[in-house]
Structures are given as structure tokens and as C-alpha cells.
A protein has these predicted regions:
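Short, glycine-rich nucleotide/cofactor-binding loops
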Residues: 1
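Nucleotide-activated chemistry modules centered on ATP-dependent adenylation/adenylyltransferase
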Residues: 4-178
């Protein structure tokens, strides 16, 4: 998506990375290879490893279906923090319902209260570095800052294998196993 937006459409981009400390070295190298080759600045928020491990463990202990919610919330919040900090009005979101699927409405919770309630019940370490998505902040970013999400993969033809081949050829991208 970075390649397409920068090379084909000529957009000025700011890459955003929520580092939950679970990245492989190869995945991190891929991020830097792409941003360096495309001359794109990178904004990274690194959460404390022990804190994030405790948060994920609390989701596992709770038995909820959506154990990836903390990572999703962390990324969404980090994107908004970066957009606000640098005055960016449009976030290009790489979510694709084709490759990531969708969930029934009753399974989807995307707010700080949910994260906090699961963590309060099952976690042990206070959350200090995790960028939680509080409703008032979400409303501020949407209504006052007027930050909008654009999801090109909802409209573009996307083939994961073709994308991997292009990334490997053009940027030295390596398969990281994820």
C-alpha cells in the first residue's frame, strides 16, 4: 500500500508503526527497508513489553474471542496520535475485509472501556504505555481534528501473493512468517 500510494499516486506519506514488541527482526527490517527506499518518515510507538504481555495474557485468560483487539486498538490509536501530532487529515488504512475477514457485530468492541475492563479483571500490571482508544479522544480526532480514514483495499484489486513478489523484487522484502 505504501508503494502504491507513494509511487503511483505521488502522495506524501507518514508511516505509522505500533510496536507491541512482538515483531520479528525480519518484519522490522522490512518496515525500515520500505520507508527508507520510498523516503517516507516513520512514526513508531513502542509499548512496554511486560505491560503488553500482561494485557494479552488477560485477554487469553478472559476467554473472549477477539484476543487481537489490543493490537488493533493500539495501532488505530497510534495512527490518530501521529495524525494529530503532524496535522495529517487523512489516514490510509490497510485493513481489507477480503484478507482479514469480518466478525459478527456482537464480537466487535473497539474502545478503551472494553480493553480496560478485561485487563482489570485478569491483568496484573498497570497500563502506562499502551495507547488506548478512549471515546472522547476518538470523537476529538474525528470531529475537531477532522481526521478521516481511507481504506483503498476495499476498492482495489489486491492479490497477496502478487504483492509479496513485488515487494521482494523492488524492496528486498523478506517473508517473516506472519
Amino acid at each position: 500500500l505504501m508503494h502504491l500510494m507513494k509511487v503511483k499516486y505521488g502522495l506524501r506519506l507518514l508511516a505509522v508503526h505500533f510496536d507491541n514488541t512482538w515483531n520479528s527482526t525480519i518484519a522490522t527490517e522490512n518496515i525500515h527497508a520500505m520507508t527508507n527506499a520510498l523516503d517516507i518518515d516513520l512514526f513508531t510507538h513502542v509499548v512496554d513489553a511486560t505491560e503488553f504481555d500482561d494485557l494479552i495474557l488477560s485477554f487469553l485468560k478472559s476467554g473472549v474471542r477477539d484476543i487481537e483487539t489490543p493490537t488493533d486498538i493500539g495501532l488505530a490509536t497510534t495512527m490518530n496520535i501521529a495524525a494529530e501530532k503532524y496535522g495529517v487529515k487523512y489516514k490510509i488504512d490497510g485493513h481489507s475485509f477480503r484478507t482479514e475477514g469480518s466478525a459478527p457485530i456482537g464480537w466487535i468492541y473497539m474502545d478503551a472501556k472494553y480493553i480496560q475492563s478485561v485487563h482489570r479483571q485478569f491483568g496484573k500490571i498497570p497500563m502506562k504505555t499502551f495507547p488506548n482508544l478512549w471515546l472522547y479522544k476518538q470523537l476529538k480526532w474525528m470531529l475537531l481534528n477532522r481526521i478521516e480514514s481511507i481504506r483503498p483495499l476495499y476498492y482495489l484489486k489486491y492479490d497477496k501473493e502478487t504483492a509479496k513478489e513485488m515487494l521482494t523484487k523492488d524492496y528486498g522484502w523478506k517473508w517473516y512468517g506472519g
